[in-house]
Amino acid sequence: MIFLTLSLVLLTLVAYYINNRSLVSPSILFCGGMTIASFIAWINQKTWNLELDIRTLLVITLGAVEFILVGYITNFIFNIIYSRTRTQKMVPYNGIPEYINKRFRSVLLIQLIILCVAIFTIRQTTGISNLMSAINYINYIQNGFIKGQINLPSYFGIILLFNNAAGIMAGYVFLENIIVKRKFDFILFSNLLLGLATPLLTGARGDSIVFLIALTILGYFIVKEQNNWNSANTKYVVVGIIGVILFVFVFEWSASLVGRNMENSNLGEYISTYMGAEIANLNEFIKNRSFPIKGEIFGQQTFVTILPTLSRVFQFTLPDYKLDIPFQILNGHNTGNVATMYYSWLYDFGYMGIGILTIVVSSVGEVCYKFAKQSNGFRIIKLIYSYIGALIALSFFSNRFFENLNVNFLYMIILWIVLKYILFRREKNA
């Protein structure tokens, strides 16, 4: 484990310097997440009786090397093409006019109405009047802890998506007010909080985590556009570490809110399970199972949220199947049922899948990052990259990239475009 951890630390440093010391480039987000997970797994090596298989070591390290190389090549090609179409020059930061802040009051009203509708829908669908109990019930069914079926209305997911999309957009404006204008706007902060909290209504904290990471990336963009992209990052690293520590405590507390059993878990064990056990679980999968595993349909583990949309578009029957993500018990300790993004890829496509899908994730992330970095002020592409960057940062946890980049993400982009058109229009006298 120590060799894996040191290798990932070295690769993270390489990614940092070849990306002009940016803390939010795809390579840094990917390698940084894997490094943290590896370090925590190393600490728990004896606890979990973790004996790292050479194949696991190669999958993780070579996967990281490939991710960095693909990102570097994509960046090189992008710079060649981009330099031919646009002359690089320094421009002042394009701030958001004050009147736009006031328009988010209407958005807040819509978000509050959606929150009330969502709560009413949850209670009506589950038949449980207590909201926390209803949320816990939904969470238990969705995770397969209890048998049952929840048939939420088709509009439910869309209205929650609106709150999330509006929250991220308001979050950018809020952060600009804090960073550039040194001003705290309560309305924008409320927009942000509703966007952050709304996913918890289904008992899922994953989208709230993506939300927080996306806001961190957006804040970094705003800060760097005020200064220089090559300036030192020491204070941002310190702030980031403090933020992570605070987040861990809040994250543990939120577990009971969405129905997770915390009675037999301490903070250290909890952190280890969510931020390091993925390496151990991947190692168990590689050691004990043969792959790729032939399923009922192509890519059923990797493209689980994309296949339903494709089945409707191309009119093919999608078999009813369940994800094969068993919970692991290592040396008497529950290490959960997630095993990095590599688990799904190996399960469906074997080692070849890692080679191909790493190219997809790295190149898509790098292109979006470059467009976001080249833009000035508020742009939709920054919101898009902040979301994609958050998914890449969570690669150490699970296959978030392909799980979240589905039709709902397209709806989110459409919502951002519509909201920008409505909220960011110039005033007649502006």
What are these regions (language model features)?
Residues 2-20, 66, 70, 107-119, 172-179, 194-202, 345-347, ...:
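Hydrophobic alpha-helical transmembrane segments
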Residues 1-101, 188-195, 211-254, 399-430:
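N-terminal "leader" segments that precede or initiate the main folded domain
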Residues 137-156, 241-364:
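Small-residue-enriched transmembrane helix-hairpin modules in multi-pass membrane proteins
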